[in-house]
C-alpha cells in the first residue's frame, strides 16, 4: 500500500501514482515543512485554486510553480501592494525569505516596517497616473486661494442667473404673442386684418347659434337688415 504524500495528507485528499502535489514537495526536506507549506498555500489560494494553478503547467515545471506561489504569497503578506517582485526590486528580499522560512517552520509571519526606498527603486509612483494630484501647478497662477475660488463661484452664479432671466423674458414674449391671431394672406383682401381672441371665439359660436331651434322670430326679423359692426381690438 502506497503512503500518501504530506501535501495530500494535510489536504485530506486521495494520493495516487499520478499525484500532482508530491513532485512539488521534493525540494523541501522536512515532512512537517511540506505539510505547513501546502496548508499555507491552500489557505491563501484555496484548495481548488492551488491545484488548478499547479496543473496549468507542464510536469517538469510544477515544482517551480509551487515554489513561486509560495514566495509570492509570502511577499503579498509582507508587502500587499508590490508583492515579492517589489521586495526584490527595492532590495528587501531578505524579508520575503524570512517569511518563507517562518511558513516552513509553522510560525506566523511577522510584519516589520519596510525601510524607505529611494525614488529609483519605487515601482509604483506615489500618485497613479489617473490621479490629478501628480500634475504640477503653474507657478504663475499663484495656486488656488480662497479669494480666487470665491470669485469663480460668484461669476458662475451671475452667469446662471442672467441665463435664467433671459429664458424667462423669452417665455413671457411667447405667451403674449398667443393673444393676437393673424389671418392668412388670402383673407387679408377682405379687409379683416387682425382679430382679437374674443372675436374669434364669437365667430366659432356663430354656427351653434344658427343651428338652434326656431323660436318663431324668423318672420319678424330679417337677417339681411341686421347691421354688423366690427371693431379692431
From Swiss-Prot:
Q: Where is the signal peptide?
A: none
Where would I find the LOB domain in this sequence?
3-109
Source organism, top-level taxon: Eukaryota
Q: Name one Pfam family in it.
A: LOB
Family from the record: Belongs to the LOB domain-containing protein family.
What is the protein name stated in its UniProt record? Answer: LOB domain-containing protein 42
The lineage, from the top, is: Eukaryota, Viridiplantae, Streptophyta, Embryophyta, Tracheophyta
Give the encoding gene's name.
LBD42
